[in-house]
Design a protein with these regions (language model features):
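Charged, gly/pro-rich active-site loop segments
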Residues: 1-6, 85-172
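Short, basic/aromatic recognition patches
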Residues: 2-22
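A short, Trp-centered hydrophobic/proline-enriched beta-strand micro-motif
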Residues: 15-30, 70-74
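Short, surface-exposed beta-edge/turn micro-motifs
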Residues: 20-22, 48-50, 67-70, 123-126, ...
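Histidine- and/or cysteine-centered catalytic micro-motif in compact active-site loops
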Residues: 28-30, 55-57, 75-77, 86-90
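Conserved beta-strand in the GNAT
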Residues: 37-40
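A short mixed-secondary-structure module that forms the rim of ligand-binding clefts
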Residues: 42-80
Length: 172
């Protein structure tokens, strides 16, 4: 796909992610097992396709140091739309980028200890995880809710797959 052809699909992807906000980030632990945890997707900014913030001393950072491949999954219960993103994570402590992305609600996830900067945009424990998207698949529901419910019930009764939307594939 040309970059011109890719842009509309990427914009759809970003639009759906912004509506859902919380991702389940899956990493591979040192023992080879997969581990998922809820992460709030931050607003879009240059430097990575998707941004997340975390404390510096968490198991996910050890996971990412050993294997930077991640999967991000999103699900919107109301519409049954879902997104699966695979990508490569990069860690940064870039203070300018942290200041650019900082949101007041981060304070809840960075408990105050001895340092008065804790919870602020100057908290030295903050690490950004930038994810560069490799590929994504997402279902865009393009039917009104009553039609979606009808399709689900019809599928349940007939054994056919409900036709509730359009599947999109994005590959960079």
């Amino acid at each position: 796909m040309t970059s011109d052809g890719l842009k509309p699909e990427l914009e759809k992807l970003y639009s759906h992610i912004e509506e859902i906000e919380i991702a389940m980030m899956t990493t591979r632990r040192a023992d080879g097992h997969l581990q998922s945890r809820a992460m709030a997707t931050q607003r879009r900014a240059a430097g990575a396709d998707l941004w997340f913030v975390t404390l510096e001393d968490t198991p996910k950072l050890r996971d990412l140091a050993a294997d930077p491949h991640v999967n991000l999954s999103y699900y919107k219960d109301r519409t049954r739309e879902w997104i699966s993103v695979s990508g490569i994570a990069r860690l940064t402590r870039d203070r300018d980028k942290i200041h650019e992305l900082y949101a007041p609600d981060w304070k809840a996830w960075f408990p105050k200890e001895a340092d008065p900067r804790h919870g602020s945009k100057d908290d030295p424990r903050m690490v950004l995880i930038g994810v560069d998207v490799h590929a994504a698949v997402f279902l865009e529901v393009n039917k009104p809710q009553p039609v979606v419910l009808f399709e689900v019930v019809k599928g349940w009764l007939t054994g056919s797959t409900p036709d509730i939307g359009e599947m999109h594939h994005v590959r960079k």
